[in-house]
A protein has these predicted regions:
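Helical "lid/coupling" subdomains associated with nucleotide-phosphate turnover
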Residues: 2-169, 176-187, 195
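General small-molecule cofactor/ligand-binding pocket signal
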Residues: 10-13, 215-219
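Low-complexity, glycine/alanine/valine/leucine- and proline-rich hydrophobic stretches
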Residues: 168-218
Length: 221
């Protein structure tokens, strides 16, 4: 075939022709990250329960990205927001494990192994919270340093808090906002959404703040 076609260059893709062609143009991290964003947006559109969720989550979690003020981290947070509801239709006991496995096995070449594990950790905790009795892929224990792992847990717990608080709509997410400084994670809750902030919700917020090594503050406006 090579002799007959007289090709000068042969590109072999490990997953698909599409990925192989795109890989040619992956000249820098920004381009690779952009492709990752596109893939995650496609997954969000195919698996999301309600419109506008990803954008609402990105806006809400933007202040928390300050725990690692780098472009690469902010991009991972955005990707996690896109993927945050990908397993809503699965059995509740299995969602964390399945979400992590889907990221670890996603057939694309636009992520490093560390990025896969980071997103897997974030999505696992988005569904499982801090529970210790849920199934979990062994791969999540590899590659990440202590700080990077803690940051993934924080983002996962923030997504968990937000999606449970949302109660199936994006409107309630517009009624809350986060603030972050060196000592506190603060949550502002508008009067219109205060009925949703029950004791269980308060406990989830405390776990989120403590995962970021900060104290929680709540302002009922």
């Amino acid at each position: 075939l090579i002799k007959v076609s007289r090709v000068r260059q042969l590109v072999v893709s490990g997953t698909s022709i599409r990925d192989g062609v795109i890989a040619v143009n992956e000249l820098n991290d920004a381009q690779r990250a952009d492709f990752l964003m596109v893939i995650s947006q496609e997954i969000a559109e195919a698996s999301g329960r309600f419109a506008g969720l990803s954008d609402a989550l990105k806006l809400l979690l933007q202040p928390l990205a300050k725990i690692n003020p780098t472009k690469a981290f902010s991009r991972l947070v955005e990707v996690a927001c896109n993927l945050a509801d990908m397993c809503w239709h699965e059995h509740s006991d299995m969602r964390g494990d399945l979400a992590a496995r889907r990221i670890l096995g996603l057939p694309v070449n636009c992520m490093t192994h560390k990025e896969r594990v980071w997103l897997g950790v974030a999505l696992y905790h988005r569904y499982a919270g801090t529970k210790q009795n849920k199934p979990r892929p062994e791969e999540l224990e590899s590659l990440l340093g202590t700080r990077s792992r803690a940051e993934a847990v924080t983002i996962g717990l923030a997504l968990r808090f937000a999606l449970i608080f949302a109660a199936g709509t994006t409107g309630s997410l517009r009624d809350i906002c986060f603030e972050l400084d060196d000592n506190f994670v603060s949550l502002h809750v508008k009067k219109s959404a205060q009925s949703l902030f029950d004791e269980a919700c308060a406990n989830r917020f405390k776990m989120l703040a403590h995962s970021a090594h900060r104290q929680p503050k709540v302002f009922l406006n």
